[in-house]
């Protein structure tokens, strides 16, 4: 019996000794480890009570922290005067070991003298860094990270292989040339648009520099990436065949010459304009609702001597109303070849149509009774019948040789048409036969 009591006593002594060590560590004053302006900011946010004394136990409870590098500090006891100060170092931030969410906001040109090793934040779930110069980012130790946003930071390299819990990634406005996401199968949203070198244009007048993007293989998963934004880059290829759960894609303003979407049957919204694509087949995308695919080889970015209306073939999905909302609602086909222009009556559920600059002489919209927004500017249309378009409220007819337009059956509130001087120029060039355009507007228009 005495032996048992002795063993229990020794165990209790061991626990007590360990607690003493922890308490000793928690009571350590680390104020001198912090940058003075960072301490001032923490004091102003009431995270610490005294800038001369910061105990680990004082900040261990902090799980959510948002810091701005610019702060206003009161100069007198009456709080009547404040001055602006800049945090130039994040020294000391590493002592916030319990952080689950961290947001850092700078002023675009901010270059901080000391940036913590983010891998030390083992509990971190969300990390957001905005406008802070950060060419490299090591988050390999943040195994629980689910949301990462690093925008306008001049980031030129990032390794996400160990961040397999990542669900949302936003690296907008950085300098990434390659991005490998093959290990990140939990991703749902990927935003990597506008990777560029400031002030420099690449071949073709484009600014984007991201030339390689590897997406995870989600074919065997019940979920996967549903939103992909990679516009304004330098991509010549984009493989989305292993991403069957994609619902929204914006890959506009790249250098794509082809885009295969037959494996993306959940696709609802696609913007692939301003690439170099000659053929597009969306027959397998029966749930498509919003499509923007014009400007292929757009005049401003075309290669010298090439036709800038590169899209010669366009196959749209067959329209089946009430199939999970799967009918085309918005279509933008600016500057495409005449042979690629679809028959609009085949898409009766359209609400928005942009067919500008397509050399059209006539346009039949009699079947499009749901149409609300129409842009048919810069065409050769001299007559336009809108009697069936009773829901139309926005119309753009700039640079069209119309003489009379009856809008009395529509709900038009916004009309864009030529000024007198522009029509005068059109008459001189023989493009328009008369100076005036007569508009018959609906009752109550003002």
What are these regions (language model features)?
Residues 65-71, 80, 102-105, 125-129, ...:
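Conserved hydrophobic beta-strand positions in leucine-rich repeat
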Residues 14-108, 117-122, 126-128, 143, ...:
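N-terminal capping/linker segments that flank leucine-rich repeat
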Residues 142, 163, 174, 184, ...:
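Asparagine/serine/threonine-enriched low-complexity, disordered tracts
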Residues 110, 135, 156, 177, ...:
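Leucine-rich repeat
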Residues 4-13:
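Sec-dependent N-terminal signal peptides
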Residues 107, 132, 153, 174, ...:
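Consensus "Asn ladder" position of solenoid repeat domains
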Residues 194-208, 217-220, 224, 295-306, ...:
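Acidic/polar low-complexity surface segments
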């Amino acid at each position: 019996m005495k032996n048992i009591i002795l063993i229990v006593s020794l165990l209790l002594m061991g626990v007590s000794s360990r607690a003493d060590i922890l308490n000793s560590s928690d009571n350590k004053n680390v104020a001198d480890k912090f940058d003075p302006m960072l301490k001032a900011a923490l004091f102003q946010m009431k995270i610490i009570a005294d800038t001369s004394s910061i105990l680990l136990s004082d900040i261990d409870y902090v799980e959510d922290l948002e810091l701005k590098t610019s702060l206003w500090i009161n100069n007198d006891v009456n709080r009547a005067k404040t001055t602006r100060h800049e945090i130039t170092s994040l020294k000391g931030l590493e002592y916030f070991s319990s952080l689950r969410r961290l947001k850092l906001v700078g002023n675009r040109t901010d270059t901080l003298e000391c940036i913590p090793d983010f891998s030390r934040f083992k509990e971190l779930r969300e990390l957001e860094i905005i406008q802070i110069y950060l060419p490299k980012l090591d988050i390999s130790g943040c195994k629980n990270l689910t949301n990462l946003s690093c925008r306008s930071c001049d980031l030129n390299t990032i390794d996400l292989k160990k961040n397999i819990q990542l669900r949302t990634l936003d690296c907008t406005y950085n300098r990434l040339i390659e991005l490998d996401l093959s290990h990140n199968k939990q991703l749902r949203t990927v935003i990597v648009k506008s990777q560029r070198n400031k002030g420099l244009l690449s071949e073709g007048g484009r600014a984007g520099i991201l030339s390689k993007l590897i997406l995870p293989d989600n074919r065997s998963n019940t979920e996967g990436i549903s939103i992909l934004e990679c516009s304004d880059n330098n991509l010549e290829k984009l493989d989305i065949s292993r991403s069957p759960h994609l619902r929204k894609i914006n890959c506009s303003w790249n250098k794509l010459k082809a885009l295969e979407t037959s494996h993306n049957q959940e696709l609802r919204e696609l913007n692939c304009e301003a690439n170099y694509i000659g053929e597009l087949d969306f027959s397998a995308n029966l749930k498509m609702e919003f499509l923007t695919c014009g400007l292929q080889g757009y005049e401003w970015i075309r290669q010298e001597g090439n036709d800038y209306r590169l899209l010669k073939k366009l196959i749209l999905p067959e329209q089946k109303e009430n199939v999970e909302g799967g009918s085309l609602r918005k279509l933008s086909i600016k500057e495409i070849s005449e042979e690629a222009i679809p028959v609009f009556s085949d898409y009766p559920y359209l609400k928005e149509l942009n067919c500008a600059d397509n050399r059209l002489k006539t346009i039949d919209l009699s079947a499009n009774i749901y149409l609300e927004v129409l842009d048919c500017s810069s065409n050769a249309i001299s007559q336009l019948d809108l009697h069936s378009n009773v829901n139309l409220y926005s119309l753009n007819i700039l640079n069209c040789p119309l003489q009379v337009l009856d809008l009395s059956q529509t709900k038009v509130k916004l009309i864009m048409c030529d000024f007198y001087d522009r029509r005068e120029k059109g008459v001189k060039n023989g493009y328009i036969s008369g100076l005036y355009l007569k508009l018959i507007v609906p009752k109550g228009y003002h």
